[in-house]
Amino acid sequence: MAKTAIAYKEKMKELSMLSLICSCFYPEPRNITAYTYDDMEIKQLNKRASGQAFELILKPPSPVSEAPRTLASPKKKDVSLGEIQAKLEAAEDRRKSQEAQILKQLAEKREHEREVLQKALEENNNFSRMAEEKLILKMEQIKENREYYLASLMERLKEKERHAAEVRRNKEQLELSG
């Protein structure tokens, strides 16, 4: 019971004075379920916790309503043969101009492709030439190092032969003197 009284007090705070007085005269709330406009009618179907549902009814056009207006097409003037020929010549000039522009764009594109290809070939040739020069320098360096190594090896061999000859000579002298 206490909960009901508290809820009633809260409800009374929410309601305006006018609503309170009206609720005294009309115990049931006023229910407006239909709204009418010129060419449509809106009916409230039901209220739910998730929202409200409405039905929209469109009225058929009344027979008294205005007939749809037809737009009058602009009056055509007589076109002479000279004007037609001038228009055809202008169209031909536009077509030729467009073709010339397209051909110019294609020529520029081809020229650009040619330049790119030429640059790529140049870079490839430069790379090949530089790689070949590096390889030649490396081979020359290897050849010089090998020649130096062989020369030092021959020098050591000659030194050993001289030493061996000197040892033999000393040995022979020892045998002859001894």
UniProtKB/Swiss-Prot annotation:
One annotated GO biological process: positive regulation of neuron projection development
One MF term in the entry's GO annotations: tubulin binding
Protein's cellular compartments: Cytoplasm; Membrane; Cell projection, Lamellipodium
Domain of life: Eukaryota
Assigned GO CC terms: cytoplasm; growth cone; lamellipodium; membrane; neuron projection; neuronal cell body
UniProtKB keywords: Cell projection, Coiled coil, Cytoplasm, Membrane, Phosphoprotein
Pfam family of the protein (one): Stathmin
InterPro entries: Stathmin_CS, Stathmin_fam, Stathmin_sf
PROSITE patterns for this protein: STATHMIN_1, STATHMIN_2, STATHMIN_3
Expression (tissue specificity): Nervous tissue.
Protein's membrane topology: Peripheral membrane protein
Tagged with keyword Coiled coil: yes
Domain SLD: 38-178
Coiled coil: 75-178
Primary localisation category: cytoplasm
Family as reported in the entry's similarity comment: Belongs to the stathmin family.
Name used for this protein in its record: Stathmin-2-A
UniProt organism field: Xenopus laevis (African clawed frog)
Organism taxonomic ancestry: Eukaryota, Metazoa, Chordata, Craniata, Vertebrata
